[in-house]
From Swiss-Prot:
A Pfam cross-reference name: Phage_integrase
Localization (cell): Cytoplasm
Source species: Staphylococcus epidermidis (strain ATCC 35984 / DSM 28319 / BCRC 17069 / CCUG 31568 / BM 3577 / RP62A)
All copies of domain Tyr recombinase, residue ranges: 105-286
Annotated protein name in UniProt: Tyrosine recombinase XerC
Record bears the keyword Protein transport: no
Molecular function GO labels: DNA binding; tyrosine-based site-specific recombinase activity
Self-association state and partner proteins as the record states: Forms a cyclic heterotetrameric complex composed of two molecules of XerC and two molecules of XerD.
Keyword entries, A-Z: Cell cycle, Cell division, Chromosome partition, Cytoplasm, DNA integration, DNA recombination, DNA-binding
GO aspect biological process, one term: DNA transposition
Active-site residues, Swiss-Prot/TrEMBL: R145, K169, H238, R241, H264, Y273
Domain Core-binding (CB): 1-84
GO cellular component terms attached to this protein's record: cytoplasm
Family: Belongs to the 'phage' integrase family. XerC subfamily.
Length: 296
């Protein structure tokens, strides 16, 4: 990998606070691009618009989804934009390339009864269960990203309000309140688990060895809980984020408030995460439409 590409990835990690999974996607996109350059005998510095079009055609020839192609092109466009700030002689060959439209989809979320099933599955009488419950409670109660969760420190938790301060994308801080269930879960965790596992750090969530938990560790915890939960077949951290937003909207929260809680700069971004369930749509329809209910 070229040195400027390594500098680019370092910038994304340090300055933009990208998660390890996002960084891996950027890294893999650059590696694939470099392989294309080598195969076609092209140079990074002299790569042109016509070459960018050929690369786009190459990606589509691999039967990739439009969403994946869009991300890969976005990675390269962002990389060249960064390179231009370091070298005035560089031109971005992807700036005029027509961006493939992303496929639209409704984000998956858990129904309230499914969330209750998850909480019931978590063991409550051992250290691992106490820790696992805090992870799920925080992700569901606040809608934070896993990259934000694993970086929460003890000083970031306010048990009086209660709420938590997190460092989001672009190193932007925000405060998210949480409810009594989450507060009690954290309180028990701090009393019975965390102090005994604390090493030379002040991170809130730790693994069973007492070290700060990783994103991979959080995903392992979630998958383990799902395997033992009847009626729940799939989970990923962002699904809990979708669930957080969906449940708030279903209970009447306004979009601007949800935007602030999620840490989104643009309201349009929040729209991708927040949608109402079919049950909620029917409930609103039945209550609002004058001819929705027969005989009334």
């Amino acid at each position: 990998m070229d040195k400027i590409q390594e500098t680019f990835l370092y910038m994304l990690k340090v300055e933009r606070n990208f998660s390890e999974y996002t960084l891996k996607s950027y890294h893999d996109d650059l590696v694939q691009f470099n392989n294309f350059l080598e195969r076609e005998h092209l140079q990074l510095e002299t790569f042109e618009y016509k070459d960018a079009r050929n690369y786009l055609a190459f990606l589509y020839s691999n039967q990739l989804k439009r969403t994946t192609v869009s991300r890969k092109i976005s990675t390269l466009r962002t990389f060249y934009e960064f390179w231009m700030t370091q070298d005035n002689s560089i031109i971005n060959p992807f700036v005029q390339l027509v961006h493939p439209k992303k496929e639209k989809y409704l984000p998956q979320f858990f129904y309230e009864e499914e969330m209750e099933a998850l909480f019931q599955t978590v063991e409550h009488d051992n250290k691992k269960g106490i820790r696992d419950k805090v992870i799920i409670e925080l992700l569901y109660a606040t809608g934070i990203r896993v990259s934000e969760l694993i970086n929460i420190k003890l000083k970031d938790i306010d048990m009086n309000l209660p709420g938590v301060k997190v460092l989001g994308k672009g190193n932007k801080e925000r405060f998210i309140p949480f409810g009594e269930f989450c507060r009690q879960s954290i309180e028990r965790y701090l009393e019975e688990f965390q102090p005994k596992q604390l090493a030379n750090h002040d991170y809130l969530i730790v693994n069973m060895k007492g070290d700060p938990i990783t994103e991979r560790g959080v995903r392992y915890v979630l998958n383990d809980v799902v395997k033992r939960t009847a009626g729940v077949n799939d989970i990923h951290p962002h699904k809990l984020r979708h669930t957080f937003a969906t449940h708030l909207l279903n209970q009447g929260a306004d979009l601007r408030t949800v935007q602030s809680l999620l840490g989104h700069v643009n309201l349009s971004t929040t729209g991708r995460y927040t949608h109402v369930s079919n049950q909620q749509l029917r409930k609103v329809y039945l209550n609002a439409h004058p001819r929705a209910k027969k005989g009334e």
